C-alpha cells in the first residue's frame, strides 16, 4: 500500500476536533461497529473513506494512533483502544508488491534500534562526524542522538511545541540544524547545551521547511515543499531569503549540494530536477523525459551526476546536468516499489524500496549496472531519507516502525 497520504493524515488531524458537523454528514460512509462514533467525531470530517481505506497493519494503526496523540488530537483515554480496534478491523493493509531480493557480491547486515518515544515518527537520519546517528522525531517534537556503540539514545526537546522536525544536517561546529516542518521555521541545536536557536520564515506562505543542507561557505539551504519555495539562511547575519520555484505547484523536496557549491533539488510535484545559483538565487529546471516521474530524493556521485529515486514509477535514474544525458533502470521490486531515500557510498548507489513488502535496501553498482538487495528486518516501513557514516555505511530512519537503522557493509 502507498504510504504517501500519511503526512496529510497527520496534518489534517489538527482540524478534526472542530469538524464534527461535517463528520456527522460523513457518518454513513463508514462501517458500523464499536469505535465508529469516536472515529466519525474526531476524524471523519477530515478523512474520507478512500483515504482511510488505504489501510495499515495492526501495528501500523497503533503507531498512527500514537502519532496522532503526540500531535494533540483529543482522543479520550477510554476511547483510544476501541478506536484503534475499529481501524484495525475495518481498514487492513492493502496488498503490496512482494520484495524481490537479489543476491550479489557484497556482504551487509542491517542493525536496528527502537527510538524511546512511541509514535515519534523518526523522519530523517543524520550520521555525524563523531560517529553518532541523529534523527528528527517529527511527531515527538524532539531530536534524538544514538550512540551506535552503546545503543544509548538521548532525546533533545525543542523550543516550540509541535515543531515537526523534518530535515537534519550538521554544521562545521557540530551544531545540528533542522527544519520545523509544522511551524514555519528552521532551528539550530547546540548539542553541548541543548539550546535551540530558531529562524522564523519571513513569508507566512513558507509554512513547511522540508529538506536541509549546508554548503561549503556555511550557508544553510532548505526546501519548502507545499510553499513551492527554496530558502537560504546566512547563519552570521540571521538573514533568511526565500525564492519561489518558477513552476507552480512543483513542490521542492529532496536537496543536496554538489562539488561546485550549487544546491540541487527535486521538484516532487512535477517531473523536474532543479538547481539554484548560490549567488543570484536564480533557479534552473531540468525536465525528466517521462512526465510521470516523481523523484523524492537524490544523491550525487563524485562526477556531480544526479541520481534519483523515482517514487512514482519504481525506477532508479541518472541525470547529467551538464550534457542533459539521462538513463533509467527499473527497481528490482517493480513499478510499485516506491524508491525513496538514496545515498552514494562505497562506489555504489544505495536506496530503499518503501512500497515493497518487506521494505528493502538496494545497492546498484554504476560500473556493472547490477543490483543487489536485502530485506529490512521486521519489514522496515518506511525509510524516507538516508545518510552515510564516516566509514561509509548507509544509515536509515524507519518512521512507521519507530526505528533507526545502520547498514554495516562488510
Where are these regions (language model features)?
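Beta-strand-rich domains and repeat architectures in extracellular enzymes and scaffolds
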Residues: 111-142
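Beta-rich, blade/repeat-based domains predominating
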Residues: 118-130, 161-173, 204-217, 247-263, ...
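Short loop/turn segments that connect beta-strands within beta-propeller blades
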Residues: 147-151, 190-194, 234-238, 277-281, ...
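Electrostatic cytochrome c docking/interface patches
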Residues: 21-38, 70-73
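Blade-level signature of beta-propeller repeat domains, shared across WD40, Kelch, NHL, RCC1
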Residues: 380-410
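The canonical Cys-X-X-Cys-His
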Residues: 40-50, 83, 87
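Conserved beta-strand positions in repeat-built beta-propeller and related beta-rich domains
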Residues: 133-139, 176-182, 220-226, 263-269, ...
Amino acid at each position: 500500500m502507498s504510504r504517501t497520504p500519511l503526512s496529510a493524515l497527520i496534518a489534517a488531524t489538527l482540524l478534526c476536533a472542530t469538524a464534527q458537523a461535517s463528520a456527522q454528514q460523513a457518518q454513513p460512509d463508514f462501517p458500523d461497529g464499536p469505535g465508529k462514533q469516536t472515529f466519525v467525531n474526531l476524524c471523519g470530517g477530515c478523512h474520507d473513506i478512500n483515504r482511510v481505506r488505504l489501510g495499515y497493519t495492526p501495528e501500523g494503526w497503533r503507531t498512527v494512533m500514537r502519532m496522532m496523540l503526540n500531535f494533540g488530537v483529543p482522543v479520550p483515554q477510554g476511547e483510544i483502544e476501541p478506536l484503534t480496534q475499529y481501524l484495525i478491523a475495518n481498514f487492513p493493509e492493502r496488498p503490496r508488491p512482494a520484495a524481490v531480493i537479489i543476491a550479489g557480491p557484497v556482504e551487509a547486515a542491517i542493525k536496528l534500534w527502537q527510538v524511546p518515544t512511541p509514535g515519534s515518527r523518526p523522519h530523517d537520519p543524520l550520521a555525524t562526524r563523531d560517529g553518532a546517528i541523529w534523527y528528527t522525531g517529527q511527531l515527538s517534537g524532539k531530536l534524538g542522538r544514538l550512540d551506535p556503540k552503546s545503543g544509548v539514545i538521548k532525546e533533545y526537546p525543542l523550543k516550540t511545541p509541535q515543531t515537526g522536525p523534518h530535515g537534519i544536517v550538521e554544521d562545521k561546529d557540530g551544531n545540528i540544524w533542522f527544519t520545523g516542518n509544522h511551524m514555519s521555521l528552521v532551528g539550530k541545536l547546540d548539542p553541548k547545551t541543548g539550546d535551540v536557536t530558531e529562524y522564523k520564515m519571513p513569508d507566512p506562505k513558507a509554512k513547511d521547511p522540508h529538506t536541509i543542507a549546508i554548503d561549503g561557505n556555511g550557508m544553510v539551504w532548505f526546501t519548502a515543499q507545499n510553499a513551492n519555495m527554496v530558502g537560504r539562511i546566512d547563519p552570521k547575519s540571521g538573514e533568511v531569503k526565500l525564492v519561489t520555484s518558477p513552476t507552480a505547484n512543483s513542490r521542492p523536496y529532496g536537496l543536496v549540494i554538489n562539488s561546485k557549491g550549487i544546491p540541487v533539488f527535486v521538484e516532487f510535484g512535477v517531473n523536474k530536477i532543479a538547481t539554484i545559483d548560490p549567488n543570484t538565487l536564480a533557479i534552473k529546471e531540468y525536465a525528466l523525459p517521462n512526465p510521470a516521474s516523481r523523484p523524492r530524493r537524490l544523491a550525487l556521485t563524485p562526477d556531480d551526476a544526479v541520481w534519483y529515486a523515482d517514487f512514482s514509477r519504481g525506477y532508479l535514474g541518472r541525470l547529467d546536468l551538464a550534457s542533459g544525458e539521462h538513463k533509467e533502470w527499473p527497481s528490482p521490486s517493480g513499478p510499485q516499489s516506491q524508491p525513496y531515500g538514496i545515498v552514494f557510498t562505497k562506489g555504489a548507489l544505495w536506496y530503499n524500496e518503501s512500497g515493497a513488502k518487506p521494505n528493502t535496501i538496494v545497492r546498484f553498482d554504476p560500473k556493472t549496472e547490477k543490483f543487489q538487495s536485502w530485506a529490512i528486518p521486521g519489514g522496515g516501513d518506511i525509510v524516507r531519507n538516508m545518510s552515510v557514516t564516516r566509514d561509509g555505511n548507509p544509515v536509515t530512519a524507519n518512521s512507521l516502525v519507530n526505528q533507526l537503522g545502520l547498514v554495516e557493509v562488510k
